[in-house]
């Protein structure tokens, strides 16, 4: 009964594989991309957000391509779908005072669009800096209590965040906070444990749950200086866990 496959490029990592595309082709499934965290990421010469039937993008200020306020978009080469999406974001209306769908007002204002057009010019440069910082972390952090992304992981990634795993994650976060290094957990509660999915709360997904217990995101953004990067590396390396 499956009609579509939702591919999530989480943390800036491209989620495409040849096998995934073959499955969609074999079973005639639509591929929908969640490209909220992977703006500008390349896979075999193509950008994420341009491979599937449609893709959703977040332009929240913290994203690789971020506006000054809340904003988002959908890309597709399906003209009919594009018209439906435009209508849904315009109260469900494609013609003034005529409503084809139950929609909402989610139009992007001109100021956000102008900011994004300007920042788009610098996206590749900023992503290159993100990858450079991630590479420094992978090469420089020496702490056996922490699992880092592998060298292979660096490919096809624009590092919206830099995730590590640590069995003593909360202790690591406290130690770094005391050293004025702020970190974030992405994400503390897995989807199947959320209140809104109460029918799935009893489901056991041990790998998912371990990741949620152990994940910690180290500081990473293209404005970081080399000195700040080295401070993160040295402090993470010397903390005893």
Residue ranges and their predicted role:
Residues 69-70, 111:
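A conserved catalytic-core signature of glycosyltransferases
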Residues 4-8, 13, 17-19, 42, ...:
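PLP-dependent aminotransferase class I/II
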